[in-house]
């Protein structure tokens, strides 16, 4: 899962959106630096990452990647799941339009920015102003996201080519998304993530 899915599942679970978004920028035990609700959100994010990586649908999808891109398949798929969530938002969350949800999420996350790591603050500058969460529905934007990550981290250069794997298996990936994401939503609503 990437940014949008983590925020969405956090909302459904009544968990800290701030902690769920911040989690990738926090190493080790967050309890000494953040309030309990944010800490719980960080731990929820970590549980979701482990759970998602171990879902049969996700393990199957990783196998569809070519040898040269398989090592970045998990990262690529995380971004792709956000694409499907953004694309199908009106079906998934008919009572909370995406634009309104993004505004709500931004307001929640903004409360922790003064005490956040600089890299997280920098991400937030772009995430909200450039409307990443709304633009995930556009596959050209997904390609730009993958290229941007490859540019920032040369060891992830294979992300650039992983676009072709997404394109080749688009329909099958979308089908897998519909298999697992509604289950995750139900688990979030039961606070079982």
Swiss-Prot record:
It catalyses: holo-[ACP] + H2O = apo-[ACP] + (R)-4'-phosphopantetheine + H(+). Its EC number is 3.1.4.14. One of its GO terms (molecular function) is [acyl-carrier-protein] phosphodiesterase activity. GO terms for biological process: fatty acid biosynthetic process. It is an enzyme of class 3 (hydrolase). The keyword DNA-binding does not apply. It holds the Pfam family ACP_PD. Keywords: Fatty acid biosynthesis, Fatty acid metabolism, Hydrolase, Lipid biosynthesis, Lipid metabolism. Converts holo-ACP to apo-ACP by hydrolytic cleavage of the phosphopantetheine prosthetic group from ACP. Belongs to the AcpH family. HAMAP family: AcpH (MF_01950). NCBIfam families: PRK10045.1. This is Acyl carrier protein phosphodiesterase. It comes from Salmonella agona (strain SL483).
């Amino acid at each position: 899962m990437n940014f949008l899915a983590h925020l969405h599942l956090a909302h459904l679970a009544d968990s800290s959106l701030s902690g769920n978004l911040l989690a990738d920028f926090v190493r080790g035990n967050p309890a000494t630096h953040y309030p309990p609700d944010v800490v719980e959100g960080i731990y929820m994010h970590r549980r979701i990452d482990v759970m998602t990586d171990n879902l049969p649908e996700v393990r199957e999808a990783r196998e569809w990647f070519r040898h040269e891109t398989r090592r970045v398949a998990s990262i690529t798929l995380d971004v792709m799941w956000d694409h499907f969530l953004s694309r199908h938002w009106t079906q998934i969350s008919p009572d909370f339009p995406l634009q309104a949800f993004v505004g709500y999420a931004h307001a929640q996350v903004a409360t922790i920015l003064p005490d956040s790591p600089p890299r997280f603050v920098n991400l937030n500058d772009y995430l909200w102003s450039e409307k990443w969460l709304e633009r995930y529905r556009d596959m050209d934007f997904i390609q730009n996201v993958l290229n941007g990550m490859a540019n920032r981290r040369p060891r992830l250069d294979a992300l650039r080519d992983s676009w072709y794997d997404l394109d080749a298996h688009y329909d099958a990936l979308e089908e897998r998304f519909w298999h697992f994401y509604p289950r995750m939503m139900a688990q979030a609503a039961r606070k079982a993530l």
